Amino acid sequence: MRLGVNIDHIATLREARKTTEPDPIKGALIAIEAGADQITLHLREDRRHIQDEDLFRLKCELKDTNIPINLEMAPTYEMQNIALEALPNNVTLVPEKRQEITTEGGLDVVSMIDYLKDFIKPIKQQGITVSLFIDPDYEQIDASVEVGADAIEIHTGEYANAYGKNVEKELERIKKAAKYAKEKGLKVYAGHGLTYQNVSEIAKIKEIEELNIGHSIIANAVFLGLYEAVKKMKEIILNARKE
């Protein structure tokens, strides 16, 4: 199972003072040293953390490595143009609202089938893998296949926020969705709200081949250092996978 480390919140810390540190690109290199298989970053329309320059610097820094860049972005034509210029390995389309603190749910692919078909085509033509960040829902999975996505990233936020019996219920939804998506020929990834405490159960789901995790790793990096925080998360994931 691959671990994509999201560097957004290194940039959040930098933007809190509008300064040059901490540098998210330096963070990406440390994460890779510690075992990250991919670097994920979300270029939001409001540029609240990651800036355009970060994406292009990261691309330059990783050009001679085999570490892929996963660009999370809203399905807007401004973002499409940036993706077609930067040419990351992967693009993950996510919903976006300016007032939200973080992404609040999955992309409603069902309601934008025609739009997404046209939107995705030129991105895929450049050899970029396209993933859709969706809720664990059969209808959304079917729509993802219809629009031509290569992969889905299952939104694990409901699972992460669940308590008591609801934890098992949400986990079951994710398991069923992962199995269904795999049967439909999609690659299956997952992410959002995953922590050192709750990641194991998701990592055990054999259909899921990649997890993208950011906030929990960066939060723990404050106390452990980034290298150790990434290493610890990777160990938990790999150990869960062995079970």
Curated annotation (Swiss-Prot):
The keyword Cytoplasm applies. 3-amino-2-oxopropyl phosphate binds at residues 6, 17, 193, 214-215. Its EC number is 2.6.99.2. The keyword Nucleotide-binding does not apply. InterPro entries: Aldolase_TIM, PyrdxlP_synth_PdxJ, Pyridoxine-5'_phos_synth. The active site is at 42 (proton acceptor), 72 (proton acceptor), 192 (proton donor). It is found in: Cytoplasm. The record marks 153 as: Transition state stabilizer. One of its GO terms (biological process) is pyridoxine biosynthetic process. Pathway: Cofactor biosynthesis; pyridoxine 5'-phosphate biosynthesis; pyridoxine 5'-phosphate from D-erythrose 4-phosphate: step 5/5. 1-deoxy-D-xylulose 5-phosphate binds at residues 8-9, 44, 49, 102. Keywords: Cytoplasm, Pyridoxine biosynthesis, Transferase. GO terms for cellular component: cytosol. Homooctamer; tetramer of dimers. Catalyzes the complicated ring closure reaction between the two acyclic compounds 1-deoxy-D-xylulose-5-phosphate (DXP) and 3-amino-2-oxopropyl phosphate (1-amino-acetone-3-phosphate or AAP) to form pyridoxine 5'-phosphate (PNP) and inorganic phosphate. NCBIfam families: pdxJ, PRK05265.1-3, PRK05265.1-5. Belongs to the PNP synthase family. This is Pyridoxine 5'-phosphate synthase.
